[in-house]
């Protein structure tokens, strides 16, 4: 399809006209089971009545004013997020990259206020935090940074799930002010952190006076079966970032702060034109209401466990399958070879997925996914994987 669009996406040859629940329809009225949810964004699926009503009603009243005025919807969503997370304050923006950029700025400003004029942040290998220059510098992907140097300095990358490496990095660099990590790496191949590792990092940050900053852009808002994935480890970060599913498809991001990170910013130290507008925040409130009222945390946990077990059982012993892993409805199937073609083959079979880290099939279906729909994913995907592996022998 020729267009005036910048050539930055390797798009699949399909476009969709409408959706309902976990299903999408293309221009030829063919139906697809959406097991990707816009890469974890459409957490309520498509056409959710409560979300549609909230967006429609708010759009009819007021779409945008400015953050130089009070925004009641913004204040209401901030209160709900604070209640759910135990955090103290919320800064809204428009995306995960912006949320993480704000977190990086906060960590540097936190250090600056303590006399550290070149604050350093410890980050993890294989991580993903965004495409702005600072978030790229924090991201554990040389490929993503290629051609965009020089990168901002002040980031120290260590192996994921390696507490001694974090401790050693802090001993080697006295200007460390924060640790930034994902509880469950998404773009990094659906790699979960150990609960003991998370608890150890929390303790280490407390001992050293560092901020623990957790990127929940992909894993937050119920995807793993709790509101936020770090809650499985029974810890609280000092900074948390959110986006993707927060407003069910309306662009929004958020940076939450607590403890020593709360109150670091002051008027003029950060800002955004569109962040936390009435429309996006009304959508965010509707998403939280739906997750609570429809029991979607429990559904994500139970249906996710069912899907995980079914995939693991059907693929057990299959040559070329390394592991099925993840939590809730954030799952990955790692193969021993590049498998990007599986996204196309699955689409041709009526299933939407994607592949990350070249050889990990990623599943991020809506939180409303039923057990029957999970079984449909298995029935379509498992034969495709086995056929692909057999052809590659």
Swiss-Prot record:
It comes from Bordetella pertussis (strain Tohama I / ATCC BAA-589 / NCTC 13251). Pathway: Amino-acid biosynthesis; L-arginine biosynthesis; N(2)-acetyl-L-ornithine from L-glutamate: step 4/4. Its cofactor is pyridoxal 5'-phosphate. This is Acetylornithine aminotransferase 1. Keywords: Amino-acid biosynthesis, Aminotransferase, Arginine biosynthesis, Cytoplasm, Pyridoxal phosphate, Transferase. Pyridoxal 5'-phosphate binds at residues 215-218, 273. It holds the Pfam family Aminotran_3. Homodimer. N(2)-acetyl-L-ornithine binds at residues 131, 272. The gene is argD1.
């Amino acid at each position: 399809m020729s267009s005036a669009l910048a050539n930055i996406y390797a798009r699949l040859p399909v476009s969709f006209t409408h959706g309902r629940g976990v299903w999408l329809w293309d221009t030829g009225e063919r139906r697809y089971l959406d097991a990707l949810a816009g890469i974890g964004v459409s957490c309520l699926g498509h056409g959710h009545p409560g979300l549609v009503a909230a967006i429609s009603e708010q759009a009819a009243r007021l779409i945008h004013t400015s953050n130089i005025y009070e925004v009641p919807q913004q204040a209401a969503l901030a209160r709900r997020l604070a209640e759910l997370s135990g955090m103290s304050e919320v800064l809204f923006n428009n995306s995960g990259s912006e949320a993480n950029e704000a977190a990086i700025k906060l960590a540097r400003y936190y250090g600056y206020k303590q006399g550290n004029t070149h604050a350093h942040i410890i980050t993890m290998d294989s991580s993903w935090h965004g495409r702005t220059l600072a978030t790229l510098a924090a991201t554990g992907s040389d490929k993503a940074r290629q051609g965009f140097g020089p990168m901002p300095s002040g980031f120290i990358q260590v192996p994921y799930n390696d507490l001694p490496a974090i401790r050693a990095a802090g001993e080697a660099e006295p200007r460390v002010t924060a640790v930034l990590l994902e509880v469950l790496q998404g773009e990094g191949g659906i790699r979960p952190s150990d609960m003991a590792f998370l608890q150890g990092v929390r303790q280490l940050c407390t001992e050293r006076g560092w901020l623990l900053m957790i990127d929940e852009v992909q894993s937050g808002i119920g995807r793993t079966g709790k509101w936020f994935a770090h809650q499985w480890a029974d810890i609280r970060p000092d900074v948390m970032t959110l986006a993707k599913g927060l407003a069910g498809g309306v662009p929004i991001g958020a940076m939450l702060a607590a403890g020593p990170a709360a109150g670091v910013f002051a008027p003029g130290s950060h800002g955004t034109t569109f962040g936390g507008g009435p429309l996006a925040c009304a959508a965010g409130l509707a998403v939280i209401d739906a997750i609570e009222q429809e029991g979607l945390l429990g559904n994500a946990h139970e249906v996710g466990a069912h899907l995980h077990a079914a995939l693991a059982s059907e693929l057990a012993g299959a040559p070329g399958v390394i592991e099925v892993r993840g939590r809730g409805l954030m799952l990955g199937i790692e193969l021993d070879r590049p498998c990007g073609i599986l996204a196309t083959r699955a689409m041709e079979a009526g299933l939407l997925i994607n592949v990350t880290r070249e050889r990990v099939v990623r599943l991020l279906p809506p939180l409303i996914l039923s057990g029957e729909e999970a079984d449909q994913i298995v029935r379509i995907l498992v034969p495709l994987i086995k056929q692909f592996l057999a052809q590659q022998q």
